[in-house]
Design a protein with these regions (language model features):
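Conserved, mostly hydrophobic/aromatic
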Residues: 20, 98, 105, 114, ...
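Aromatic-lined substrate-binding rim segments of carbohydrate-active enzymes
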Residues: 1-32, 155-178, 235-242, 248, ...
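Active-site-proximal loop/short-helix segments
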Residues: 36-45, 91, 108-157
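Active-site-adjacent "subsite" loops/lids of carbohydrate-active enzymes
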Residues: 18, 29, 34-104, 108
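Glycine-rich, proline-tolerant flexible connector loops at the mouths of alpha/beta enzymes
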Residues: 1-5, 118-137, 229-237, 247
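Aromatic-lined carbohydrate-recognition surfaces of secreted/lumenal glycan-active proteins
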Residues: 25-38, 115-122, 158-202, 272-285
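Surface-exposed cleft-lining segments at the edges of enzyme active sites
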Residues: 85-90, 145-165, 192-195
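Substrate-binding cleft of secreted/luminal carbohydrate-active enzymes
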Residues: 206-210, 214-233, 237-322
Length: 322
């Protein structure tokens, strides 16, 4: 497979933007920040704990950076377990790694913007507040609140908010880096005020992003527990517990239209600088539901999976392999 890839005579970074522009469309570079991959676990573990049986049980991938610097992956309070593939944004080195990589990719093609997906394919946390105890976080929390999260009881919500601040800091730094290039910035998240499964209760301070125009488009309703292409359930044996909001079982979540009206509309309408889109890759097509969403005054548009549209055969058999 690798040899075939190396023999491809065209560059998708060049071709895709050109095709999009010829059709009057904009081309965004799609990247992720919580999906650096994980090592291949022992076979005994893989027999009962895996991403999905079709293609990700006895195979894995991992970025060179996360493999070279394992301590940058988020860690639990006892410094015993890491959530592989989820790098800690409290480290300036991690933020710099993403910034340089994204800018390098953007320079390789005629893109109109950058889309950051907050989905993760890493093994879910066993409980929502399991990870987020790397040394810089401990130091910042101690400096800010006078409490050592390694040794003392601490306020969970202020800790969750601190984790969210690192995400906002990264978006601010990224926004500043994109300004000279005149590129737009979009983010895709779960609905609600936390990052959610499979990551944790990290505060998702999207209101601040909108108010200060750190982003141009906000895509909500993303889902990490299900493949957006073939709809396999991912890590179905590891759902975790303790989430303040949970899109998997609907805990503390309003129906999407009500949620948009009660929570997103006041912020989006007031600021009038950010467009709101609703992800529909994980929903069956419904003209009625889609029409209702599109008629909502706050919703700019819907997001679909081109894979499901272009590949009826693999969708029907539930397997995209030839």
């Amino acid at each position: 497979m690798i040899s075939c890839i190396n023999n491809v005579a065209w560059d998708d970074f060049k071709v895709m933007p050109s095709l999009a522009h010829n059709l009057g469309l904009k081309a965004y570079l799609y990247v992720s920040i919580f999906d650096e991959g994980f090592p291949l676990f022992p076979k005994k573990i893989r027999e009962v704990s895996y991403h999905n049986k079709m293609h990700h049980q006895h195979f894995t991938r991992q970025s060179d950076f996360s493999r070279k610097y394992p301590d940058y992956n988020v860690v639990d309070r006892n410094n015993e377990h890491r959530q592989w593939g989820v790098l800690c944004l409290a480290y300036p080195e991690v933020r710099d790694y993403f910034l340089k990589r994204f800018l390098r990719f953007l320079n390789d093609g005629d893109f109109d913007g950058l889309f950051i997906c907050f989905r993760s394919q890493s093994r879910p946390a066993d409980f929502a507040d399991q990870y987020g105890f790397n040394k810089p976080i401990q130091q910042d929390y101690l400096a800010k609140y006078g409490c050592n999260i390694y040794e003392q009881d601490f306020n969970l919500q202020t800790w969750r908010d601190l984790l969210g601040e690192y995400l906002t800091t990264f978006l601010f730094e990224l926004r500043e880096s994109l300004k000279p290039l005149s590129l737009r910035l979009s983010v895709g998240t779960a609905r609600g005020d936390i990052v959610g499964p499979p990551l944790g209760n990290t505060t998702l301070n999207w209101r601040k992003w909108v108010k200060h125009r750190l982003i141009d488009e906000l895509v909500i309703n993303q889902n990490s527990s299900q493949c957006p292409s073939v709809w396999h359930q991912l890590w179905p044996m590891h759902r975790g517990y303790g989430y303040l909001q949970n899109y998997i079982d609907g805990y503390n979540m309003e129906p999407v239209l009500e949620h948009i009206s009660s929570t997103y509309t006041p912020i989006i309408i007031k600021n009038k600088t950010v467009d709101l889109f609703v992800a529909r890759q994980w929903n069956k097509r419904s003209k009625t539901e889609e029409a209702k969403l599109l008629s909502h005054p706050t919703v700019k548009g819907l997001v679909f999976s081109s894979f499901r549209h272009d590949n009826p055969g693999p969708i029907a058999r539930g397997d995209w392999r030839v």
